[in-house]
Amino acid sequence: MMIAFGSSIGTGLFLGSAGSIQYAGPAVLISFALVGAIVYFLMRMLGEMAVEHPVSGSFAAYSRAFIGPVAGFITGWNWWFTTVVVGMLELTAMGTFLDYWFPALPHWVTALVTLLLVVALNLFNVRVFATTEYWLSLIKVAALVLMIVLGFALVLGLGPDEAIRFSNITDHGGFMPNGISGVLFALVAVTFTFGGIMSIGTAAGEADNPKSAIPRAVNSVVWRILVFYLGGIGTILLLAPWNEQESNESPFIRVLSGVGFGPAATALNVVIVVAVFSVLNTMTYSGARMLRDLARNGQAPRAFAATSAKGLPTKALLFDAALMGTVVILNFFFEGKIFAVLLAIIVGTELITWAGICISHLNFRKTSKSATFAAPLYPAANWICIAFFILVLVLMGILPEYRMGLATLTGWIIVLGLISLTTQRSRE
């Protein structure tokens, strides 16, 4: 569970949040609260299905069982695609964070070295991965808690300077400087920030006692949203003016440096680099196994179903690594322009996964009238979530920086749908 928890703390929070702050100002807290509510509803839906039908790779399994084989095919491949694109984004982000110490180092170099390290780690046995990822996740969680505590201490005047209080929230255009439109536009980047939290539900589904582990894990999401997302972003907004944030640097590092805590900023940047490596490590691990499972189910080339003597899906791992490695070339030619496109694609793939959960749950309830861990506000919550998905897709079409990612995603889904239909007809 610590590994799944840690995977929800990464580039989205430490870097992606800067863009959402630029759109909404302090009112970005409303955006985080809205997306947090949607995520909670989705986690409860996933949790209800997982308690009744605990399976590994639950996203695709539930779509296949409660929507249909085409939906299961698309959801499974979409989740694999998400792991690859998130890996590419983390490799790109690594260069941004290492600019703190090595501003002249090309990002393609950091991406290449980081990828080689992660692949080498994943070629060891599963125990090495689990141990490494547990400690990386623990470091991330502890550092973020310390950051929040330090921030509120400065706000209350417990540091060397006078209390900052709430001037950075009320000044500089007020709490909602860009109006409702700013809050809405921020929803896209905030959706990206919440992407990793869904892995908590899938990890719980593989627990020894799902009927007790799943409700405990899902209900804890509320506190994680409040503490790590609202608490972390709230600390940033209290410590520094929102309009001083830059989209190409971490607001957490900028704020700590700005209030005179240079050593703390350096230490936090170390933790952020660890966080990026951790998420990349998890995506590499889970993506290879998703591709292996797709191959075992006859939905991917059989070669990817093969495993080594240690039980590792080596061919799938190396294939995923090769795809992630294309971002090294992209960073060589288009350094500084790749992050926004990858972020947009990931937001879209997240929405597909979330929609799969939501619609699966609607159909699941039609066949299962009594549930041990029933999701609240059914079916209203499902339709609220679907309306939210449509809203975010519309916003992606309105905002120029997300259009290319939206177009790429649309093409990907069309291709998957056609392949699935063609495969199904050939079997018939």
Q: Where does each model-flagged region fall?
A:
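Hydrophobic alpha-helical segments of multi-pass membrane transport proteins
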Residues: L121, A143-L150, L291, L343-A371, ...
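Membrane-interface "cap" regions at the ends of multi-pass membrane proteins
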Residues: M1-S17, I21-A27, Y40-R44, S56, ...
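Extracellular loop-to-transmembrane helix junctions
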Residues: L15-T110, T114, V221-L230, G405-L416
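TM-loop-TM module centered on a large, flexible mid-protein loop between adjacent transmembrane helices
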Residues: A61-Y62, G68, Y100, A217-M283, ...
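Helix-loop-helix connectors at the membrane interface of multi-pass transporters/channels
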Residues: A60-R64, E90-A111, A143-L146, A204-S212, ...
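Membrane-helix boundary/coupling elements in multi-pass transport proteins
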Residues: F14, V55, N78-L91, F194-A207, ...
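C-terminal membrane-solvent junction of multi-pass transporters and transport-like membrane proteins
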Residues: W135-L136, A303-T314, L351-M404
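Helix-loop-helix junctions that connect adjacent transmembrane segments
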Residues: P103-P106, L138-V270
